[in-house]
């Protein structure tokens, strides 16, 4: 929705080697070497501060989402996603493989997964963002596998800058957002020092799926019709056949309030209206920076970043979610007609089939607590990071930079209106309407057998349950780097320029933990959570040493204007859980410039990423995964073949489907199933090899073209099989021809009562972590930038300049294999439960800016190619199994009224394009929401933002 679609600026990438007459010494993202000029042997591009201002984002991730090299990550645009965190994913290899830096230094991760929340980056102070997509483990550390996003802040700011913006949709006038930033800076001691303070406040309203016609009703991805959750109202029930009981009432049945009878099929509950397309946000930021030059050899500096973001997300009302309770057949709230049916099913004699009888029935209950209202997840995220350092010149053109940094990220999550499993069980064990059989803790008998409204406020007050979860991450980083050249004694005779080198030492320690209240630590006790959240803690240390070299080989010879070599190596010692491992990362590459306007470049790198705290120490817990069709559901199997070896019916029985449920097993509730996953302390580092080759061409002044091919191969990847892999490995004859119980079948844990993957009695599908995976991607990046005066078009030069840019990404392959026994899944051009959100073959942004004096107009065209549902799986509705190419157009306008006052206007999704509709279970739980992919497509609509900036 709010993606700016910024084109990567080409000022960095487009300059040929050593083309400047004056050698400016700078440091380039991707290396710690300070070299003349701003050249890189790997693809590197920039987003300027002006581009960021023009698009008026309220969060950093917004202008990243539209970049060709970026893949939308789960974030604020996903219901029940990341607790308000905004992350970056380059090349689609995962947010944990993209390194985020501020001024070349690490930020503390917000989670145990090692991912940085970009909400903590102050937009008001951004000077430039460098995106390095060639791997940078040698320069910055093991986790820079797919690339680096380096946010460079303004230096030595003076004066006052007050910026504010307000935005809303043009049709419904909702999803409002307000942002205000105040920045103050001043020089000290005859300009020897500078201090800056920037504070900001952002408030963004949430947008519910019920606010859009395409999101208000949950749609079945197979049939296209309305669907929902089996946890419904009136309640749905099922129970196993008892001794002497009848075969009727298999499957799920619902009480008809008019007759009191159990009828089938049960009506599903629409969970969409209360869920979010966009999560609301209240964020407060404060950033302070200072530097002071003590002498020519020492400049002290310090930075402090503080962010407090509060997010209140909602989910559909809580309920019993298919848990089984021991309910007396004489529970007074059971209608007489339904009681009679249950007695027949269980074989209970007529004498006992009366109100007040204590004979227990194991009853699977699916009651939605609509009387309780929505579930709330309140997140309070606090990040504090401070850095102290010293830098300066050593002598002989060598410089140093030493710093220490500590960051803390703390999250408090409060769950409200979720309900207690134990209290529901106690309240259902009642023989009259006023007291429970176990009448402790103020127990109030619960009526789950009536229509909406049958649960009274007193009942709700008893069964209600809130929960508290705490998370803390602390990161300490100590770093020393020195760089310079080796002088004119050790030079190539064909170049005459010194070798530039950089040495760096770094020590990093990450300590992380979670804690929760007693209720949260019990499996299923907090209704609707699906998993316990036991306390956990872990830490790891890294000690690293690196060396980099830039070696000029040839200069100013025929067809060899410049040939340069770049080498680097990083040695890492990784320590965790009392064990240590040593491994290395390296890079080798160079450039050849035959003429001034043309430069070829290539780089090969090996990156080694250590597993993060979550991958190592996360406990094994039961969560949720999407699944539209259970291989054993409905008439796919039959009781006649239940004992016939080699049949699907027999295999379903052997993997946990009771014979009485064969032929009537319902579809997964809400299109979701239980999924057992967790960390693995035995994990080792994964290895990635990155290759890039390309060229930079400036055929004429102010026109630049870059073309780069990239290939990234990850071995020993930390990965886990998808639920689809496990289910196919067991039930699909392509992988299990004999339909016998195999290793995949051993990872399946069905509900012991009804055979589904839902309810507290089901562990679900196990997806363990290992180092057995592989992942690779390759493609081509093309960037073009051209600036021309309109006089070249035959117009008067007073009509200003046109800036044209085009950024294009063609992905050639995108494959992964989580284990050797899994299939190698090629997700390019597909979306599915296994592949996740759409994986585009092509993306491009075309941006045109027209500047006339104090006015500027901007036009941005964003394109993503068409995708289809991954073949070979569930037969989804054809209309949902294909998404055509999408085009978005954004506009912007700037008026510099005076030197002090600037006015901005931006319009995103000018044509008010609606998102593609795919239903609710065709993708993963995190990406497929509100019948679409809201992180990949605009689910909000045309959005207009007004802004103003005052400087003095």
What is each PLM-predicted segment?
Residues 25-55, 82:
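N-terminal periplasmic "start-of-domain" segments of outer-membrane beta-barrel proteins
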Residues 83, 112, 205-207, 213-220, ...:
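Surface-exposed, low-complexity loop segments enriched in small/polar and acidic residues
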Residues 105-133:
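Short acidic/polar hinge/loop motifs at secondary-structure boundaries
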Residues 422, 704, 812-815, 862-872, ...:
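C-terminal beta-signal and adjacent terminal beta-strands/loops
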Residues 623, 804-896, 911-912:
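C-terminal beta-barrel architecture of Gram-negative outer-membrane proteins
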């Amino acid at each position: 929705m709010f993606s700016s679609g910024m084109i990567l600026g080409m000022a960095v990438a487009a300059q040929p080697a050593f083309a400047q007459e004056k050698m400016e010494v700078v440091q380039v993202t991707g290396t710690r070497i300070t070299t003349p000029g701003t050249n890189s042997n790997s693809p590197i591009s920039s987003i300027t501060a002006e581009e960021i201002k023009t698009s008026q984002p309220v969060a950093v991730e917004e202008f990243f989402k539209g970049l060709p090299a970026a893949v939308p990550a789960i974030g604020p645009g996903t219901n029940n996603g990341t607790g308000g965190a905004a992350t970056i994913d380059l090349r689609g290899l995962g947010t944990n493989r993209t390194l985020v830096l501020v001024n070349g230094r690490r930020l503390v991760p917000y989670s145990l997964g090692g991912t940085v929340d970009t909400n903590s980056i102050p937009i008001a102070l951004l000077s430039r963002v460098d995106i390095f997509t060639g791997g940078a483990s040698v320069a910055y550390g093991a986790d820079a596998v797919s690339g680096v996003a380096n946010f460079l802040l303004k230096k030595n700011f003076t004066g006052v800058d007050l910026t504010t913006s307000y935005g809303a949709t043009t049709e419904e006038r909702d999803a409002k957002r307000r942002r205000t930033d105040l920045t103050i800076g001043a020089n000290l001691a005859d300009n020897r020092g500078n201090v800056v303070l920037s504070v900001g406040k952002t408030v963004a309203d949430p947008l519910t799926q019920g606010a859009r016609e395409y999101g208000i009703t949950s749609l079945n991805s197979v049939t296209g019709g309305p669907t929902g959750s089996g946890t419904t109202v009136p309640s749905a029930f099922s129970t196993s056949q008892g001794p002497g009981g009848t075969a009727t009432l298999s499957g799920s049945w619902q009480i008809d309030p008019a007759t009191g009878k159990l009828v089938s099929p049960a009506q599903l509950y629409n969970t969409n209206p209360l869920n979010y397309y966009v999560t609301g946000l209240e964020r407060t930021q404060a950033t302070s920076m200072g530097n002071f030059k003590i002498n020519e050899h020492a400049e002290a500096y310090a930075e402090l970043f503080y962010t407090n973001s509060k997010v209140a997300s909602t989910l559909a009302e809580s309920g019993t979610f298919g848990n089984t309770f021991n309910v007396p057949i004489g529970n007074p709230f059971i209608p007489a007609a339904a009681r009679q049916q249950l007695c027949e099913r269980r074989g209970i004699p007529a004498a006992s089939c009366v109100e007040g009888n204590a004979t227990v029935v194991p009853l699977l209950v699916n009651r939605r607590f609509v009387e309780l209202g929505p579930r709330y997840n309140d997140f309070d995220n606090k990040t504090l990071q401070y850095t102290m350092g010293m830098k300066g010149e050593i002598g002989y053109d060598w410089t140093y930079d030493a710093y220490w940094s500590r960051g803390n990220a703390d999250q408090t999550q409060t769950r409200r209106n979720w309900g207690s499993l134990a209290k529901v069980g106690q309240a259902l064990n009642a023989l009259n309407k006023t007291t429970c059989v176990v009448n402790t803790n103020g127990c109030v008998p619960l009526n789950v057998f009536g229509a909406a409204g049958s649960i009274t406020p007193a009942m709700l007050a008893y069964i209600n349950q809130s929960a508290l979860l705490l998370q803390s991450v602390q990161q300490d980083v100590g770093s020393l780097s020195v760089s310079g050249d080796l002088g004119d004694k050790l030079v190539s005779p064909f170049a005459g320029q010194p070798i530039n080198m950089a040495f760096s030492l770094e020590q990093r320690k990450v300590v992380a933990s979670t804690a929760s209240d007693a209720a949260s630590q019990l499996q299923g006790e907090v209704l609707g959570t699906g998993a316990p959240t036991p306390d956990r803690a872990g830490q790891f240390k890294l000690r690293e040493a690196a060396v980099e070299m830039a070696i000029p080989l040839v200069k100013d010879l025929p067809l060899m204007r410049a040939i340069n070599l770049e080498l680097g190596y990083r040695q890492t010692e990784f320590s965790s859980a009392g064990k240590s491992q040593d491994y290395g990362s390296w890079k080798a590459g160079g450039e050849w410039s035959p003429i001034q306007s043309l430069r070829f470049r290539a780089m090969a790198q090996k990156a080694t990423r250590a597993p993060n705290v979550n991958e190592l120490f996360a406990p094994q817990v039961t969560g949720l995964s999407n699944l539209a069709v259970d291989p054993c559901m409905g008439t796919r199997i039959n009781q006649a073949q239940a004992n016939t070896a080699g049949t699907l019916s027999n295999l379903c029985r052997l993997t946990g489907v009771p014979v009485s449920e064969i032929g009537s097993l319902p579809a997964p509730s809400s299109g979701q199933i239980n999924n057992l996953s967790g960390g693995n302390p035995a994990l080792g580092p994964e290895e990635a090899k990155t290759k890039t080759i390309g060229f930079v061409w400036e055929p004429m002044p102010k026109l630049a073209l870059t073309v780069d091919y990239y290939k990234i191969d990850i071995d020993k990847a930390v990965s886990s099989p998808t639920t689809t892999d496990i289910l196919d490995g067991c039930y699909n004859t392509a992988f299990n021809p004999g339909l016998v119980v195999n290793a995949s079948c051993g990872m399946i844990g069905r509900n012991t009562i009804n055979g589904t993957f839902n309810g507290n009695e089901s562990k679900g599908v196990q997806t363990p972590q290992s180092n057995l995976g592989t992942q690779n991607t390759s493609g081509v990046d093309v960037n073009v930038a051209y600036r021309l005066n309109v006089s070249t078009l035959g117009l008067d030069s007073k009509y200003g300049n046109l800036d044209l840019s085009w950024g294009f990404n063609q992905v050639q392959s995108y494959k992964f294999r989580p284990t050797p026994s899994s299939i190698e899944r090629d997700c390019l051009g597909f979306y599915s439960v296994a592949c996740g959100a759409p994986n585009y073959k092509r993306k491009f942004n075309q941006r045109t800016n027209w500047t006339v004096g104090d006015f500027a107009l901007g036009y941005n065209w964003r394109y993503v190619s068409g995708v289809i549902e991954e073949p070979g799986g569930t037969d989804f509705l054809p209309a949902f199994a294909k998404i055509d190419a999408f085009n978005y157009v954004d506009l912007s306008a700037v008026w510099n009224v005076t030197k002090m006052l600037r006015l901005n206007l931006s319009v995103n999704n000018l044509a008010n394009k609606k998102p593609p509709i795919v239903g609710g279970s065709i993708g993963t739980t995190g990406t497929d929401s509100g019948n679409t992919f809201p992180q990949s497509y605009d689910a909000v609509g045309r959005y207009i933002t007004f802004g103003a900036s005052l400087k003095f």
